Design a protein with these regions (language model features):
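N-terminal targeting sequences that direct proteins away from the cytosol to non-cytosolic compartments
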Residues: 1-85, 143-146, 168-190
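Conserved polar/disulfide-associated segments of primarily extracytoplasmic proteins
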Residues: 71-163, 167-174
Length: 190
């Protein structure tokens, strides 16, 4: 009697399962691409903005404010918007963070700079700008002929930190503050 060896059946492959797996992977990939475009800002993200900064990676709508960087022959360490009516300014700068640095480190460093020369810096108020946690505080500058009020806001996204500062004379500060908040509401990362 001869025993015939029969090879065990291998796993069967279903065309339906393969299609489902490939479709699932394609959907996941599309989700990653969509999230990346949203996170980085896709084409046209700054179409409604009046100010766009490739250097510091943002765009905002700031009607009535002029970007002074385009009018100066020297490179400023910040972007500066000016309101011609009263010379109020918004200064915007960004820095690369060291590994492990976060919002608390940026807040401490910025407040240390602001409080030099005996300037009294107000309490930190937590808020959000463009969907990321931010911190703000106010202080007054008495040097010069006109007392100046300053609102400073810092926030972190990824490995970069932004410092945005409104400076206006005390009499017009509240008016400019409303415009400043409008500008911040339009903040878009590029």
């Amino acid at each position: 009697m001869e025993i015939e060896e029969v090879a065990p059946e291998g796993p069967t492959r279903s065309a339906g399962k393969a299609i489902a797996v490939v479709a699932g992977l394609l959907i996941a990939l599309a989700g990653v691409v969509a999230a990346g475009v949203w996170w980085l800002g896709g084409p046209g993200v700054c179409d409604r903005s009046t100010v766009e900064s490739a250097r510091f990676g943002y765009c905002v709508a700031a009607p009535g404010w002029e970007l002074t960087n385009e009018a100066t022959s020297s490179t400023l360490p910040y972007d500066e918007l000016i309101k011609p009516a009263d010379a109020s300014t918004v200064r915007i700068m960004a820095i690369q963070l060291q590994t492990g640095q976060g919002l608390n480190d940026v807040v401490k460093a910025a407040r240390d700079v602001a409080s030099q020369d005996g300037v009294e810096v107000g309490e930190v108020v937590q808020r959000r700008v463009a969907g990321v946690p931010a911190a703000q505080w106010d202080f007054a500058l008495d040097a010069g002929q006109v007392k100046q009020q300053v609102r400073e806001i810092v926030f972190v996204r990824g490995d970069a930190a932004w410092r945005v500062q409104l400076q206006a004379d005390s009499e017009g500060f509240d008016t400019r503050l409303a415009e400043f908040e409008d500008i911040l509401r339009t903040w878009t990362f590029r």
